[in-house]
């Protein structure tokens, strides 16, 4: 019997997280000795629904992948079974990334057509990274943005309530749940319910109890007493299994009988704003934690209804970014070395609706009095206003410096979002943040467009 496979990626198979056409092209490039230096840009064309900005995330996983991106024996055996040539597989056995990477720091707010990552390397090496880079940066940026919007709501309309990711069980797979927990922390959450994210990334973990705990005992009182006897002052009780208000009163009675100061109670159903006020009246010294269907919209509605909460536990809406489930990032060739022309030459697509800006870029962010005013998208070698957001992170295959801590990244997000114009932060009808195209890049784009159109005539 063939053993079942859970579907884990390992360092030995990580390089196979690539669409087949990447390997098809690699084999062709090497067979034709077509290995010029090339540059690729990873960016998104449009903001997702109701988004005024995107929080860049996932760079650390990109860099971790580059650290160990090799074709192990298991990967090579599989590719041989798939019909790839022996000479090609021999070359893959010695694969390692030797190029350069520039990127915007995680936690930076970004806008359409601005590179989040730029890669310069021999064409086969840069090409191989497409699927993996898009997967890691696109998904985490989507979730970090969703989380940042929730954090912004509780900062602007609440009291800075605690936010905990409860969404791993509803995520689209184990890797999605794990990376969503990290991205939520990057976006400003305080922790996650997922232990694996605590172990892998150091994200603080939180947990209370499930309805099954309460239901497993003969009575609600016995379930509360058993929990309180086990966890004492650390106890947070789920009080809505049968009747929320009665559950709150019972929780108070059990705590007093046991001589315990309850840490808090959790509400997971019903008219949460109304019930939270009734619970707070009965348990004024206990934290009230609210879950069930939470996102930036329901949290804002809860707060505007004068609900009482010390924390929220968003789940499905967070880990799936339910209202805007796709960022659709792209990874496009923007420059390539051409024989006889000297150095990298800018390249672009002319497809309808998918025109790209050619060449490597700089993204200048112009600020005034600590607030972001506008960005300028320009050529990499072009002088321009504002600080360039793209920083070297890998040079000749080696990391340039140590990565920031997760807490430092989280602070970068907080600082970036607060620096945006208030209208851009609106969660339903955000204003447009201005991104200007430099004169040099505009001229380069028009020059290359004209040349390509003439070539096709």
Residue ranges with predicted function:
Residues 212-370:
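Glycine-rich phosphate/ribose-binding loops and adjacent secondary-structure elements
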Residues 1-231, 333-457:
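Ordered alpha/beta subdomains of enzyme catalytic regions
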